[in-house]
Amino acid sequence: MTASERNIQHAIVARLRWHGWMVRELSQPRAVSGELVGVPDVIAFKFGHTLLVEVKRPGGEVRASQRQFALEIEPHGAPTLAHWITSDVDDFARALNYLELMSDIVTVREQE
């Protein structure tokens, strides 16, 4: 993961946590062991909803294993599952706001 991908990922994770999501970062050298190849960098949960986020630097390319993972989970998706590939924090924030609005997910901070 490049420095710019790390910066983007940190900003996305911070945004998710601010919105009350329980977040786990999965990005690590997984290909070495052959396990979890293609699995996104970030997984987040909130009120039964699951988000999978693959972080790319601007202009970064999606690997074949990441495309394959997206194809494999697609038939198992539900309205509560989103799998995003992003390199833009602002676009991600807008998509997250839209998802929460459309899914009636209330941000914890808005309840306080």
Annotate each language-model stretch with its function.
Residues M1-E112:
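Catalytic phosphate/metal-binding cores of nucleic-acid and nucleotide-processing enzymes, i.e., regions
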